């Protein structure tokens, strides 16, 4: 677990820089308990049956967001790739945009985020490297913006900020090669972290996002790395929080 006293002391001693602070602990799978009860990690749950019929059948729940009593589901692998919208009872409300190249449309949607401050839903179109902004009510596109760099995934930080993960294979130049880019909602770069790393192993993997939200924190890691990072919003920096140890375990 985190050592809060160490974190606070070190945070006061260092200025934010382009390389992550190293405060990591070790997460060992060999020391993990063999059995974890679901009741210990899930305390509140419900079953919602989605109204899927006719033209709103879902092939794949690629990504899901729940905001303001609505459920947004990105189906990135259907023939007519789209974002479906349901209420909390499962009733079908509509869709965000549509597959195509016209205004408010996308070709390869690969990210779905909520901009809580402005009550908007954001969709990243990988094919055109563009970010689309939709009003939650009504479900209309209000603007589209070209992204100034290539990235693997993106997540909202709140406070009108976005965090982007730039993979080693992205054809960027200069500071855009750094793995973490922080931008505002107008896609102006505010900061960047972690110099480019070439991972020794290659392969195909279907991961929609490297970002994971826990409470108010954003954690991230690459599938081929044993390092887990967290974005420290208060100090606007990246912290190397954990190292995952499989020891003698094999995949």
Which ranges hold each PLM region?
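Residue-level detector of Asp-centered blade-edge/turn motifs that repeat once per structural unit
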Residues: 66-68, 114-118, 156-159, 213-214
């Amino acid at each position: 677990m985190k050592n809060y006293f160490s974190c606070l002391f070190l945070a006061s001693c260092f200025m934010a820089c382009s390389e992550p602070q190293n405060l990591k602990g070790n997460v060992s799978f060999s020391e993990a308990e063999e059995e974890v009860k679901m009741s210990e990690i899930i305390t509140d749950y419900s079953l919602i049956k989605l109204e899927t019929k006719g033209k709103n059948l879902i092939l794949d729940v690629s990504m899901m967001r729940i905001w303001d009593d609505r459920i947004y589901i990105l189906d990135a692998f259907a023939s007519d790739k789209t974002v479906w919208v349901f209420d909390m009872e499962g009733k079908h409300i509509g869709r965000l945009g549509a597959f195509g190249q016209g205004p408010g449309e996308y070709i390869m949607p690969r990210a779905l985020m909520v901009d809580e401050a402005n009550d908007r839903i954001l969709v990243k179109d990988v094919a055109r490297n563009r970010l689309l902004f939709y009003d939650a009510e009504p479900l209309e596109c209000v603007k589209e913006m070209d992204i100034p760099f290539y990235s693997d995934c993106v997540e909202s930080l709140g406070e009108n900020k976005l965090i982007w993960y730039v993979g080693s294979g992205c054809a960027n130049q200069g500071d855009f090669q750094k793995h973490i880019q922080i931008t505002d909602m107008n896609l102006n770069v505010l900061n960047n972290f972690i110099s480019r790393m070439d991972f020794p192993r290659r392969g195909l993997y279907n991961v929609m996002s490297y970002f994971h939200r826990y409470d108010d924190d954003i954690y991230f890691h690459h599938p081929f790395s044993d390092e887990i990072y967290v974005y420290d919003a208060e100090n606007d920096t990246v912290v190397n929080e954990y190292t995952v140890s499989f020891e003698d375990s094999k995949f």
